[in-house]
Amino acid sequence: MAQKPNFLKKIISAGLVTASTATIVAGFSGVAMGAVMQYNRTTNAAATTVDGAGFDQTGAGVNLPVATNSVITANSNNAITFNTPNGNLNSLFLDTANTLAVTINENTTLGFVTNVTKQGNFFNFTIGAGKSLTITGHGITAQQAATTKSAQNVVSKVNAGAAINDNDLSGVGSIDFTAAPSVLEFNLINPTTQEAPLTLGDNAKIVNGANGILNITNGFVKVSDKTFAGIKTINIGDNQGLMFNTTPDAANALNLQGGGNTINFNGRDGTGKLVLVSKNGNATEFNVTGSLGGNLKGVIEFDTTAAAGKLIANGGAANAVIGTDNGAGRAAGFIVSVDNGNAATISGQVYAKDIVIQSANAGGQVTFEHLVDVGLGGKTNFKTADSKVIITENASFGSTDFGNLAVQIVVPNNKILTGNFIGDAKNNGNTAGVITFNANGTLVSGNTDPNIVVTNIKAIEVEGAGIVQLSGIHGAELRLGNAGSIFKLADGTVINGPVNQNPLVNNNALAAGSIQLDGSAIITGDIGNGAVNAALQDITLANDASKILTLSGANIIGANAGGAIHFQANGGTIQLTSTQNNILVDFDLDVTTDQTGVVDASSLTNNQTLTINGSIGTIGANTKTLGRFNVGSSKTILNAGDVAINELVMENDGSVHLTHNTYLITKTINAANQGKIIVAADPINTDTALADGTNLGSAESPLSNIHFATKAANGDSILHIGKGVNLYANNITTTDANVGSLHFRSGGTSIVSGTVGGQQGLKLNNLILDNGTTVKFLGDITFNGGTKIEGKSILQISSNYITDHIESADNTGTLEFVNTDPITVTLNKQGAYFGVLKQVMVSGPGNIAFNEIGNGVAHAIAVDSISFENASLGASLFLLSGTPLDVLTIKSTVGNGTVDNFNAPILVVSGIDSMINNGQVIGDQKNIIALSLGSDNSITVNSNTLYAGIRTTKTNQGTVTLSGGIPNNPGTIYGLGLENGDPKLKQVTFTTDYNNLGSIIATNVTINDDVTLTTGGIAGTDFDGKITLGSINGNANVKFVDRTFSHPTSMIVSTKANQGTVTYLGNALVGNIGSSDIPVASVRFTGNDSGVGLQGNIHSQNIDFGTYNLTILNSDVILGGGTTAINGEIDLLTNNLIFANGTSTWGNNTSLSTTLNVSNGNVGQIVIAEGAQVNATTTGTTTIKIQDNANANFSGTQTYTLIQGGARFNGTLGAPNFDVTGNNIFVKYELIRDANQDYVLTRTNDVLNVVTTAVGNSAIANAPGVHQNIAICLESTDTAAYNNMLLAKDSSDVATFIGAIATDTGAAVATVNLNDTQKTQDLLGNRLGALRYLSNSETADVGGSETGAVSSGDEAIDQVSYGVWAKPFYNIAEQDKKGGLAGYKAKTAGVVVGLDTLANDNLMIGAAIGITKTDIKHQDYKKGDKTDIKGLSFSLYGAQQLVKNFFAQGSAIFTLNKVKSKSQRYFFDANGKMNKQIAAGNYDNITFGGNLMFGYDYNALQGVLVTPMAGLSYLKSSNENYKETGTTVANKRIHSKFSDRIDLIVGAKVTGSAMNINDIVIYPEIHSFVVHKVNGKLSKAQSMLDGQTAPFISQPDRTAKTSYNIGLSANIRSDAKMEYGIGYDFNAASKYTAHQGTLKVRINF
């Protein structure tokens, strides 16, 4: 409220001003306005306006006051006094050649004041104390001037009828403010502007300004005399202005606001303007006491376009001259107008919201000698022409628009320039303006958004040595003018422009300065790509691994001498993002801490080339690697210096080019099979070096390629590979054939993967290993030149190898094969031998084949020793054809595998015969060698012990002669071939006794006469081929050690009948021995507890199996000759043992085992031919193994012969032991001897016995009808279920399977179905019982019940004739197993909704609909079976009142049921495993019926009503026919007839008096009934499986006939409209219980 008077004052003041202005306008309009007559009053003496004295009059002695709007024409040399209160006169017209005094004694308004006709004279005004003179400047038109009238109302023209322009104040002289407060106000009716101001001439001076107030209310006024600066108070209104273009006080200076004077900017907006014009001959310096403008008001312009000038804070430059720094103390604006050569100097602090720098022509300069601050949200604009601003202290220019002008802001050393600078706010496409720092300085944002500082200006410069700190976003070029110039970029700085691209302002030269980073930064343009000296000396990244320098330029140029990008101790990242095709980084990359720093060029594509023309890191004693270099998919060239990179990342098949320098690349990261390394040494410097520890690619992610570029001048390009260097690439290739050599001379171990040379037929040149270097090649290798291995170096080969030759001049080189797969080494035959290798070492499991091409006379490789090492067990080394074994040292350290799996490395010789003599080193006792013949040549062994076996690569190839044995010292060899199935030697001859500790795999083996061969041992125990006993006489011997495995087709023969012995010293598989016409002398089996497998026939004068167990492994095995002794088990399997002739004696330990395969009828038999006899006492147990997987669905008995020719069997078989395998448990077996003395096996069907026994031991043993149904099932042997059952392996599974089929749940489902309908009938009885009371006076005072027979709830008495009711209910019932019938658990939920009415006083009728859902879970042996019943019922019901207190009630019901059943069935798979399946039934059922009850009501006690009741109920359920689905073999078709039931119902209910509790009436009730089934039956359902001939019989009804009910209820009524009820009932019968809850809602109408 305190503000209201001021507010009202402003309103009133505004109204008065408006009214006054309107009056003036109307007056000046004169006749045209038709309002007031305009007069021209002339003076003739001292004049006063209020009475008109001294003016022309209407007559003598009459003083007519000067009227409003009159023009006063001064004709006499007399003073004029304006004393009309609030006088509003048109103007003053000087028409006398005198300067006149004008006194303002009352507030007066004047239009023009002119001396147009007397220009040498003026009006000197004196304004009285507290009075005001308001100048409107209003002129008159020619029409007005010609029609003005005198006091006599006669036309008296002004200015001879000529017009006087608006704002003509040429007649103003001095203005004397006599006493405070005197006011001079300019309220121009035609406001002037700065461009055309109202000008007060040189004669317009101020006298006693200390008493005055100057108001510039409307218009722009220019003053020419310094005295105006002495006015005590100057007020400038909004959008109005005052211009000082005045004489100076002294020495060209004008003092403003001295002596307490003030210049104020009034108005709400504070947009008044003060213009200070510097002009030669006038004031050029303006000394300001205090400051101009403030509180965001006042626009001050300093104009030096005519002459250089200075705006000075009188208190010194450290004081404010424009605005103040106290919150909102800034001036609204500050404009500096300059011109070329006419500079403006501001010697004081400037605080203005907006600053404008404008130069009339290019070259204007403004110097701020102290602070400049536009504050938050302030702005600076440059206009008109190019200009230069020099600041001396910190400056804040805010949002600065260079206006597309060549503006330069110069910042001195150690000062801060604040602002947001834009080249052209109107067109962002233009770039203009330069910010120049003399040395140290800071450029920061002056906006609330600190990010954007510079937008599209030409440049930010550093002229001298110093650090300029930048932050935010700068759209400008950075220029460095001194070697010591540094730009320091804060975290997040963005430079949208180049660095050192163009010369500094005034074409000052660029210099190799530096850039330092305090955090992440972005530079989008080229760096150092300008003229001479543009290259930068240093770029130093932030000492923070997380910070990133993003460079988007295509040329990043450093100084030739020492130009470097420095990664500090913690690293940092350089990100290269240029989209240009060619990108050059001409800097060394200096790394402070090993494995730090990142260069990220991941955004580059394969169309771009990145060149790093400088060193990266340091290689040497103090190696420092760049942490990571990601080249993206670009072509990256690393030249002009050594390179040390910890991780080189290549994406999308990028490539890196290595020139003639040294490169350390600890690791490459690339997608598998991507990335290329190009070895591109220049024509003069042909060598490229990979420093120790380099890894190109990896085993998991090899490079795509390592490539030798176009050959150098000398024809080759050499890659020198340091210690531990690994090269992983798919291919190592060359552009030119025979160019590219790999030299490993630094020691250590290296790996080279991929294919080396040979692509498109272009081979590499050569390979050199020296100085103890180990190199492992993983892929195919192709060199045009030779391979040299010296200085104890090792060449490891994993794949095919092509080279001219392999040599070791100092005989120290090792060629090692580490291949896992077969490989070939291809060499060129030579004219002479090269240096011999120390050794060839085989270390891998793959085979190696040497191959030579060409026509030379000397082998391309020579070696002293061959050694098998590491994983070479089983590997084969194929020597060059024509290389003999005679002089080679052959060693092994790989052993020979396990005892059961002998193995050996293999040396293959071909194209030449070899001889092995004593003293030659071949293997040792723990490391056996395998020698193999690769051609049809021979090996002669004269060495007593040869730690080797001999093999062949092709069957019937190679001859071996063994002569190393001496008397009492048989020769030793480790096998002739390895095992059955291997290629066979063509011929083996034993000339001396021999122990062969291996197998014999040979087409022909000859054991000379009188020579004994013992064969089999650690190297093998197989025999495949033919052994001939004796060279002539047949008297040779062969012994087979334990576990001899003869091939079934093997043969042992003698050169003479009944000569030669064969002995088995242990277990054996035996082939053919002798023949029927040339039997051998003896065949003996001498081992203990051993067995023999007979695969062929034996013909010998004497066969002695000793206690061996015999297994017959061929379909027919013949034993022939003289005598045969057997005293062990004979296992026939399913084969025949034929005794062809002679006598066979079976000892006491003899037993017989045979196998019957029922599926094909095969059984092992003994066949005793006509010429043979078998003598045996009673044998041991006869084991009969039966594999019975055949179907048991057969009838009768099947027979199989065990001994044929039983009449020639002198003995008795022991009691049989049947060992049945398979899944057939339904068959019985026996062994008998028939009439012809043959022994016979019998097989009999036993299904009925197995099933009956299984069911008798199961849970369904006592289920009613189950045994009858099982008999029916087993009679139908053609059903799928029957045949599936025969797959069972477990009798308990059989009982489960058949029990699920032979039992059912029909009785339970039918019972529950009828019970559900009965529940709905009971609920209808509830309603009938209630309505009956409406017509019975005996019940009028007793709460009604709705409990009918077997009811489940109580109802209150109805007091209305009709209503709608709903009763939801929930029932849980459980029937335990009874009479062998499986029980069940049932849950029923439902609701009945009815509508009824009274037909008359004694008859009620109604209809209802009910919905029920019952879930049945069957129990006991039917557990897991489920049935769901959904019912929809429709009912009619009624009640009739008979004679007093007697009544009848009844109902009829019709129910539609949807029944879904899920019954468990089973299925056996082929392995006899039982799997559960679900047989689903889905059928509809109809149930209908009705009931009729009679009863009597009487009041037994006061308030107690007893109602005995009795009646009958009848229900009937329809037939069902459906087929189950869902099982494989056990779906049944079901057909059932109807079910029905007649029940007698007897019981009573007792209803108590109503209880009123808070107007809520409660009616209690209790009841009990007995229900007895008097007639009816459940349906006898019939079911059949597909293919079944007779139906199953359904299980009978075992439920109790009598059940009992007791229940209680309560009905609640709150008003006549609504009733609610709740009830509970319990039902019980034999092994049956049920609980039911009921709710009720009823609306009475």
UniProtKB/Swiss-Prot annotation:
Task: Name all Autotransporter domain ranges.
Answer: 1357-1645
Q: Which ranges of residues are annotated as propeptide in this record? A: 1329-1352
**What Gene Ontology cellular-component terms does the record carry?**
cell outer membrane; cell surface; extracellular region; periplasmic space
> Known PROSITE patterns for this protein?
AUTOTRANSPORTER
Q: Which UniProt keywords apply?
A: Cell outer membrane, Membrane, Periplasm, Secreted, Transmembrane, Transmembrane beta strand, Virulence
InterPro entries in the record: Autotransporte_beta (IPR005546), Autotransporte_beta_dom_sf (IPR036709), OM_autotransptr_brl_dom (IPR006315), OmpB_passenger_Rickettsia (IPR022095), OmpB_ricketsia (IPR048195)
Record-linked Pfam families: Autotransporter, rOmpB_passenger
By sequence similarity, the record places it as follows: Belongs to the rickettsiae OmpA/OmpB family.
**Protein function:** The 120 kDa surface-exposed protein is a major structural protein which may play a role as a rickettsial virulence factor and/or immunogen during infection.
Q: What is this protein called?
A: Outer membrane protein B
Which organism encodes this protein? Rickettsia typhi (strain ATCC VR-144 / Wilmington)
